[in-house]
């Protein structure tokens, strides 16, 4: 009986005791916010000092009691802001609520703007992406491995706060914006690092879901306090924060528009004139580019935000997430990186989505990863390491899978040359030979670019070879789908082969340039000229600048490899029309050019579906396949909620539709492409604006799209 009573008492204590784990956010040189969650008692006390045995200052804070549909526990959210601290100083602290106290932890305030943290002039950051999954120990394993790696790199007796200033999480900190997920997915899975390193967050699409949605995000984080040069975004969706000589710009890919872009321009104007800022890093949840689930990116980030950021010579890179893998690429003409740090969320491997190999992506690896960014403040250098713990199919022990860098004030590579001698006309195939890569600072070759044109000024490119020394894309062999293949293994990228019959006969010009692994381009080589003869079959191309146009907006068609007849022409017709039987909507002759553009300045006045064709010698022989496009208003689709019960009714509102014959709305699973995958649900649209309801969807992630018949 005594044993039974003892066991029962012990179980009750375990059930009702409160283990306290602090969560740090919003670091500055003079302050730190400390948060934690309990299930009872509104006492909020932090006790801190300059040594673990001398905690002699007490700070009290506030407690908010949150409630949420379906959350049956108490949720006391404690917040204490410690102020009047010294810059770049290590403090020891513990937190207290009632009779419960945490262990003693430590944090470090940020250095003054422009200054390093360490004695050897460094400041470092951790970057991590999506966690989301509650039921599996994925993200907690990732943070534990990051904790271990910091110990391994900087010494077993060191604390994370000694060598890293903060962690940036790039969105989808939760799967849905509920109290349950903030408690058990975000806070609980971060306890390896959150007592030592402040965590700054970016809004992801999953923060907008669930019973509380963004209100839960706003309640847990204090982004409205963050300013740069006294500039606030005026909301908690996006912000700029300086740490040392780095300015982080956390964008919201979920709240795009002119207001955010205007704010971004204000931030850049200040940063460009701020001598304490040497580097700018931007972040958004939806990425700049992606080679899986192609198109699932932020077009606003790609087309608006990043082009604006690249106008600053302080801009280093853009970091995205959303895709649950690691990817790294470079902007084609500018010395800027773009990353996906996709954490450990729902499985994403080769063969489960639409995939495409893009020039501006050097590697896509389906690993669960984190990155350590090391900034050498004194010498103007940034080095980034990416560590992997593997994934579902293969585990890895903090394996280093990528490194890259950017160093200021370094020389560009030596100017290359085309070493071929063209003393007579040539027949294809032709291998263009570039000179050996050379750099005065021992940088290695990363990228080469060969351009071939029939125009001496390269105004129209007939053929381009743009290659990195490595190109990790697609499944490798017949093994597990996490294995990625290096498509450029064994390829000498200083050589480029023009295949037989791939370009037409005629005179061509060629030039090349080389890029090193510091993202510096060489000067272009001297141009060489050659003549192709005996090419029987050309490889003409024909593209439009867009697939959707508003009424009366310009339409540009670009063609290469044409026959070169004086009256070759580009024409536009309505969908379903035969060119020989009707008058075109408009046409333009090529005037004997084999390559060029046809600009329809005033576009088309009437909404509808059309196609453009490339025709030979004033007749109706089509040189290339037709290009279909749409003219009309931009349709707006809006779901009434972000989440729905399984089998329930999904309501889609639409407006500004063209209301053509048999327009329809389809429901597809994320990653599926209309026309190549079976849709889940669909229905016709009969008005320009209205509502459609879809019922019976199984569990999963979906999107709605407006399609034309």
Question: Where do the protein language model's features map onto the residues?
Answer:
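Active-site-proximal segments of metal-dependent phosphoesterases and phosphodiesterases across multiple
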Residues: 139, 255, 274-317
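Acidic, histidine-bearing metal-coordination/catalytic regions of metal-dependent phosphoesterases
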Residues: 17-137, 160-161, 277, 386-389, ...
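Active-site-proximal beta-strand elements of phosphoester/diester hydrolases
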Residues: 120-135, 245-255, 281-285, 336-343
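Core catalytic region of metal-dependent phosphoesterases/phosphodiesterases
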Residues: 143-211
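Binuclear metal-dependent phosphoesterase catalytic core
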Residues: 23-31, 331-412
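Extended, solvent-exposed regions of the mature portions of secreted/cell-surface glycoproteins
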Residues: 503, 521, 525, 534-709
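Extracellular recognition modules
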Residues: 92-96, 509-515, 611-615, 703-708
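Extended active-site neighborhood of metal-dependent phosphoesterases/phosphodiesterases
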Residues: 90-112, 181-274, 304-317, 325-364, ...
